[in-house]
């Protein structure tokens, strides 16, 4: 039972949350807000060659908190949370493209490729025991993002 694992009474849990789904919803909201903040740091730096510290921090967080990642992203990273995260990333990137006069169907397909590719790379990385280290994985991911950006 969750309350036993957390070391709290059922009364304390239900004082704060209606049920376990309310807890998950709140935790997902916090993670999506973190992702939104990450996008705030990544999008303005898309033309820079150096890996943004926020991307390295994301991989370090996933490396240090694998249980949290598996809880949110589910088996094979195909959960409601994952879909929401992908939509958030795509919406933010598409918004940037449209602000610069873009947003064509071709760009939308390239963006879908990039977003799904990033998530696929993360799955492969976690399946490989989070090797290479977070810093190197962030650099690989950044290189892939920038390669697609050239095509946009």
Language-model segments: residues:
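An amphipathic alpha-helix adjacent to DNA-recognition modules
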Residues: 4-7, 14-40, 44, 56-59
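A short, Lys/Arg-enriched amphipathic alpha-helix from helix-turn-helix/homeodomain DNA-binding modules
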Residues: 29-41, 52-60, 83-90, 110-114, ...
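Short alpha-helical DNA-recognition segment
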Residues: 1
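Hydrophobic recognition helices of helix-based DNA-binding modules
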Residues: 27, 31, 35, 39, ...
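Secondary-structure edge/capping motif, primarily at the C-terminal ends of alpha-helices
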Residues: 38-42, 46, 69-72, 97, ...
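Helical hydrophobic small-molecule/effector-binding pocket
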Residues: 48-94
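Amphipathic alpha-helical packing segments from all-alpha helical-bundle domains
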Residues: 76-101, 105-116, 146, 150
